Amino acid sequence: MLAEIISIGDELLIGQVVNTNATFISKCLDEIGISTRRILTVSDKPDCIERQLADSLSHADLVLTTGGLGPTHDDITKKIIADFFGLGYEFNEEAFERCKALFARRGREMPASNRSQGEVIEGSVVLQNTRGTAPGMILQNLPNYEGKFVVIMPGVPYEMQEMMRVSVVPFFQPHSKHFIKHTSLMTAGIGESTLAEQIGEVKAFLPDGSTLAFLPHSVGVRLRVSSKGENFQAVQKEHAQVVDALKARIGGYLYATTDMPLEEHIGELLKSRGLSIATAESCTGGLIANRLTNIPGSSAYFYQGFVTYSNEAKIKALGVREETLAAHGAVSEETAQEMAAGCLEKTGSDIAISTTGIAGPGGGTEIKPVGMVCIGVATSAKLGSRSFAKTMIFWADRLLNKERFSEAALNLVRELLNAS
């Protein structure tokens, strides 16, 4: 079964609202083996909706729309779709009573205009809205469109998501004849082209039902492996074989087989070994500490974070020597090492990670260009009392450079833990 998603609303076209609905719907469909062919956004003008509905029905078995189901004059989706198929309305008492009850719970009288939300397209399967006032509908057995389905849902994400999970997915699950299995292979410290070369042999001999998608992020790549077929056990077996072959090829660049951010993986490593970490950041401005503490339970391993942006702060807070700054500059491996060593000494943590660099857009030189970062690491006796630094250079704007600096620092911690 092929699906197309039509998101309706001028607010989407002008960028006022981000279209999260289409992403959610396509994920839900994928989980039950329904492939999304296209995602389209159209204006809430009648001719735009009509043209797109006709076009989508000519290509897909299932068309899902969101938006335009409210009680105001510009909410016209229900009328346009009913007129398109030459269908009338019928009154759904349950939907109307739900709407009245919602206003009553809020201590408000229901406006007369909301009575229209009890009207549904005749012959439709009504999708009750447990979080709002507008019911959804599934249209089937449509004149001139035998075997086609149209799903109409509200545009409010909070309402649509519940309707999709509770009503739409269970309705269409029996209609799908395919099983789909996905695995995300999360890598760090490797670029897309290098990874493609490394797994080239596996890619060349992929079974017909399996595909690979390269999804690059800051300093690594998420490799999505997908397998599809009509026999559940065969899909599972084929998928496992492909994943195992890829894991063997990727080697130490692989850190997870689920959609897990690097900071979560590092948190698991630290927690499992009873280790703590502290940060001393200059160019990343606390981003590493922020990422580590975004993970629930991070208090078990995150000790403290310093943001020492100025040279004076590096000297006072971390004990970086003035002589080091004078001789090598703030952006140097020597300074990064002293920042990490000072952080380790002051916190007593097991690992200290530091960053000092040039995020841009200004401040770069021929020797120290924009995008250069020096990352320092210091460890306690538990990890061999090590102290070292590494220089890396990226090419991006200021915010993306900061993101890449933080990712590179976290990956250095990962490599350290894996080697210890």
UniProtKB/Swiss-Prot annotation:
InterPro entries: CinA, CinA-like_C, CinA_C, CinA_KH, Competence-induced_CinA, MoaB/Mog-like_dom_sf, MoaB/Mog_dom. It comes from the Bacteria. CDD domains: cinA. HAMAP family: CinA_B. Pfam families: CinA, CinA_KH, MoCF_biosynth. Belongs to the CinA family. NCBIfam families: cinA_nterm, molyb_syn, PncC_domain, PRK00549.1. SMART domains: MoCF_biosynth (SM00852). This is CinA-like protein.
